[in-house]
UniProtKB/Swiss-Prot annotation:
Name of the protein described by the UniProt record: Daisho2
Disruption phenotype: Adult males infected with spores from F.oxysporum or F.verticillioides display reduced survival.
Role of this protein: Peptide which plays a role in the humoral immune response to a subset of filamentous fungi, including F.oxysporum and F.verticillioides.
Signal peptide: 1-22
GO cellular component: extracellular region; extracellular space
Membrane-spanning residues: none
Keywords: Immunity, Innate immunity, Secreted, Signal
Other facts: 'Daisho' is the Japanese term for a matched pair of samurai swords, one short and one long, and refers to the role of the two Daisho peptides (Dso1 and Dso2) in defense against fungal infection.
Subcellular location: Secreted
Tissue note: Hemolymph (at protein level).
Gene Ontology process terms (BP): antifungal humoral response; defense response; innate immune response; response to bacterium
Induction description: By bacterial and fungal infection (at protein level). Detected within 24 hours of bacterial infection (at protein level). Induced by Gram-positive bacteria M.luteus (at protein level).
Length: 46
């Protein structure tokens, strides 16, 4: 179960890096919400 969350997190992170030019993105991974701004900063929320 923990491996599934980690794999999902890395998958979402890779997907975010692949589409970084899209601007602000909201990523749901591992039970957390990662918000990527145009400055490539991540805000982590539970």
């Amino acid at each position: 179960m923990n491996c599934l969350k980690i794999c999902g997190f890395f998958f979402a992170l890779i997907a975010a890096l692949a589409t970084a030019e899209a601007g602000t993105q909201v990523i749901h991974a591992g039970g957390h919400t990662l918000i990527q701004t145009d400055r490539s900063q991540y805000i982590r929320k539970n």
